[in-house]
Amino acid sequence: MAQALLNAGFGNFVAADRLIAIVSPDSAPIRRTVSEARERGQLVDVTCGRRTKAVLIADSGHVILSALQPETIAGRILNSRGDLSGA
């Protein structure tokens, strides 16, 4: 089976099948999750110096920071699956 890759922005790709959540970075629990991932060495920053707008959480415990909106990333996942209904 081919691995589905998701464009997380600026030429960076993430294994779409490994993602369990795409969330906004604004809440305290998500900020704490990002901080804990940084301490564990499981934080991947693909923002290229831009403001973090989405946090992707993988099933491996890795936390990925992206400069794209969560809606944009979710839309890319749906488009890659061929599901354009959004539901």
UniProtKB/Swiss-Prot annotation:
InterPro entries named among the record's database cross-references: RemA-like
Source organism superkingdom: Bacteria
HAMAP family per UniProt: RemA
Family indicated by similarity: Belongs to the RemA family.
NCBIfam families registered for this protein in UniProt: PRK04323.1 (NF003315)
Protein name: Putative regulatory protein Synpcc7942_1027
